[in-house]
Amino acid sequence: MANWLLNVSEKWLRPVYDVLHEQLCRKPVLHADETTLQVLKEPGRSSTSKSYMWLYRTSGCAKQAIVLYEYQPTRKAEHAETFLQGFSGWLHADGYQGYLYFDVLPWLNLFLRFCDDWR
C-alpha cells in the first residue's frame, strides 16, 4: 500500500504541488521556518538523527493561502535557496543564518537586536 501511495502522489499530487510552488514564489511576501523531526528506518541514517521539515507560506495578506512543506535530511541553507529560487520579495523568517542570502534579510538582524534590547 505504501508503494501505491507513493506512486499516486508522484503522478497526481506532484503536478499540483509544482503549480502551487510556482505561484508561491511569485508572491511579494512569504514566511519560512524549519523544524526538526525524527524519521525512523530512513535508509543510510540512524533512527536518532535529526531531519527537517521546512515550511513556506504566503503572508496573511494574501487573498489565497498557500502553505507548502518540504522534507530535507539537513538544515543546510541551500535547501531554502533552491526552494525559493526565483523569489524576489520579502521573506519573514527567524534568525537562522541560512536565510541571510536574501537581500532583504540583513534588516532582520537589526530588528532582532532591537527586540532583544527592548525586552
Identify the role of each PLM range.
Residues 1-119:
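Catalytic center-proximal scaffold of phosphoryl-transfer enzymes
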